[in-house]
Amino acid sequence: MKMYRLGDVIIKVYENQQELESSKLEGCRSLCPNKMGKPVAVEIICPSCKPKEGEWLFCHFINQLNDFKLVMDKVV
């Protein structure tokens, strides 16, 4: 799993099913059921987010992050 911070927002990128299953739902999680690629899910955690989960909520968002390499602090 990769984690990024953008201000008060934390973005978790789950790269496989095992990471996803072992992580508690903390924010708004978008499941990406594309079996051929990564990520398998993306979760955005912020003070105003109520925990919820659904398919394809914002998977294209994380692909844009990968494509454009937006400036974010990687959480170590």
Swiss-Prot record:
Top-level lineage group: Viruses
Identification of the protein by name: Uncharacterized protein ORF76
Annotated organism of origin: Acidianus bottle-shaped virus (isolate Italy/Pozzuoli)
Organism lineage: Viruses, Viruses incertae sedis, Ampullaviridae, Bottigliavirus, Bottigliavirus ABV
